[in-house]
Amino acid sequence: MEFRKEVEVAKILVGGKVEENVVEIRYDPLTLQTSRILKKTIPMQSGDFQEEIDSTRSWCPFCPERIEQMVSRDPEIMEGELWKRGEAVLFSNLTPYSKYSLVLRLTEEHYVPVSEFKSQHFFDAFKLIQEYVKKVPEGKYYVTIGMNYLKPSGSSIMHPHIQVMISEVSTDYFARLDWSALEFKESNGVDYWKKLAEVEKGGERYIGSTDKTEWVAAFAPKGFFHFTGIPEEREFMQMSDEQLKGIAEGIAKILRYYGRKNLNAFNFSMFCADRIGDHFRTNINIVARTPFAKYYWCDVFYPKMFHDESVVFFVPEEYAKEIREIWSEL
């Protein structure tokens, strides 16, 4: 496992003085995809969007008073019913991305500040999704669980919700993870994520643990403040309640950290190992997005859209140290 990076230095003239700007190009240890880290501070401030909260609440299909009538339903596995647990409600995606495509309403509240998400919210969600995955017919499927929160993340509906894709065809990046992980297992005799947890534990990118789960800052981040969760139990469908609670608590802790940084938008994705092979381990990735405000800016621009290369402004080792020092408080 190699943590490879290259450095370029750009010189610019500012106010009559030459300024040197360091750019790190880092290679993902598994996929070799590159990310660029620009060691330059940029403003990341959230603003007031109460008007947006109020206006979207008036028509939101996920609010308690509308969800029974407005959401679409699964006629097969769920037999037209809505599955519920705590505040979580599971139903079909009106705009399906795959053969089995679901949405899970996460909270009853229309808007939740990131620091106020509870681990119970995510635990209940994962339990419902786990129940659904167990009922999917036999065959090879790629299972991903993801969340977009607020407009900078790509979310079209403010109300907190999770999306589930269960597809016979992997997404492009999932395929890259799959075959890269297979090569790693064949060469090293252990799955990549298990080895990553061993290598990173106690190091400068290690941030802490929750039940049966280790958390690290990604060496080659795909977004701002990118963290990866590595569970002890490999397959999502077989995970114990203790394991699911560990994942849920880790996500909630990271969101509370984002809240302290005045970040309010995020994405996460869980790549599930179910039905793939023992070379793959379920892994969770979460990134912050530019803060939502009336005039927010999008952090996905041409390098990401056309070069598939992330550009970030924060150094993993620095923010790992910051969150590690307060992990027990979060």
Curated annotation (Swiss-Prot):
It comes from the Archaea. InterPro entries: HIT-like_sf (IPR036265). This is Uncharacterized protein AF_1331. It comes from Archaeoglobus fulgidus (strain ATCC 49558 / DSM 4304 / JCM 9628 / NBRC 100126 / VC-16).
